[in-house]
Amino acid sequence: MVKLNELFPKHGSRKAKRRIGLGVGSGLGRSATKGMKGQSSRSGNTKKESKEGGQMPLYRRVPKSGFSNATFAKRFDYVNIGSLEKACKAGEEVTPETMKTLGLVKCAKRVKVLANGELKKGLKVSAHGFSATAKAAIEKAGGSVTVIEKK
């Protein structure tokens, strides 16, 4: 019967690792497959992929194309009416600054109120944007909605 410690891979199925730089007699010594002198033969060699040694690099040969409106996009921080219900008292005036102090938003520059959750308290909410259902839910609970115009 074959024992586990006697198992070995079939001859020729596993290739031996090349141990370079271990003496001239090994056949892979001296320059250790790195060629002669130059940056590539030195230790710690890393050439940038963008460098092509005098040839015009690919990123400069290919023309620029396209345009993205991402830089002009209006980015909002979002607050749900469920979190306003938990954090605010009835009749309270809620502005983006108060939302920031309560920890509901990270940035008070642009805030949009969404309708996830339930609102039973009448709140006076001021924000830069409201979803239609959030606006309806706030007004149904006896609150008011003020849209802040941001340039």
From Swiss-Prot:
Pfam families referenced in this protein's UniProt entry, alphabetically: Ribosomal_L27A (PF00828)
HAMAP family linked to this entry: Ribosomal_uL15
Region (Disordered): 1-62
Function description: Binds to the 23S rRNA.
Annotated Gene Ontology cellular component terms: cytosolic large ribosomal subunit
GO molecular function, one term: rRNA binding
Protein name, per record: Large ribosomal subunit protein uL15
Gene: rplO
